[in-house]
Amino acid sequence: GVPVELVVAAPERYGTALVRATGSAAYVAALEPLPDAPTEAGVYAALGLPFVPPELREEPFAGAPPALVEPGDVRGDLHCHTTWSDGRASVEEMGRAARDRGYEYVAICDHTPAVGAVRGLTADDVRRQAEEIAAANEVLAPFRVLRGIECDILPDGRLDLPDDVLAELDWVQASVHGGQRMPGGEMTKRVEEALRNPHVRCLSHPTGRYINRRPENALDLERTFEVALETGVALEVNGLPLRLDLSGDHVRDALRAGVRIVCSTDAHSVRGLGNMPFSVMTARRGWATAADVVNTRPLRSVLARDR
């Protein structure tokens, strides 16, 4: 079973109990003795300290805490699917729903054929989908629907679509789906080869995990971060509740290595666009600020191929 700890506190000490329950032992010890306060903010005020969000209560640090990314900082969703592959809404429906959430842009990233379990887009499909995206942009302007793809990384590191097709797109996500049990050296070489493709902008769900269903693959993340930094490829924080990949710990390691991240929903329906808070909360656990997240930027910056 899953252990559960129930904390009961009087209203006037509720904030104190929250700080104790959300901080690590080392962090709380550095604050002792904690004053009684009804709110967390009250605890910090009584100590004469700036408020520290729960995600940062791991270890004591000097100075003001960084301003972590908030859901409201996100300007667009860069990983969504439609009925062209395994999604349940059309291009226009996904675009309209993203616009209604206050976004400035959304990238349609349907699968390519090698994904196997679902229908993937061929080169001809990608070009036919472009017509539907153009029509949606006429209706939804100034909101922008981006031409994207979630392109499978083949076992040898090649991508599942030719370069001339990828060059036409606004946003290319590279993903491993099959072969998750590949040995670490082979998996790392496979992903590195894909990251060196000049059209790739982001590596999707890098560790391939399904929480409580499938463990992380054997990808050498330290090496992957080095290559991502060298090539300018961002790493995704996938907001599907089963994935949350990168994890908070991996996000922190990526940021320490100088790698940028993308907060995405991997939405397969209009409802799936609501996964963004899960992605942002995971990024926050890795101490991500808005400046660390590609899609907190305006569209012109996202489209700039500043790898």
Q: Where would I find each of the regions flagged by the language model?
A:
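Charged catalytic cores and adjacent phosphate/nucleic-acid-binding surfaces used
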Residues: 1-82, 88-102, 106-108, 113-143, ...
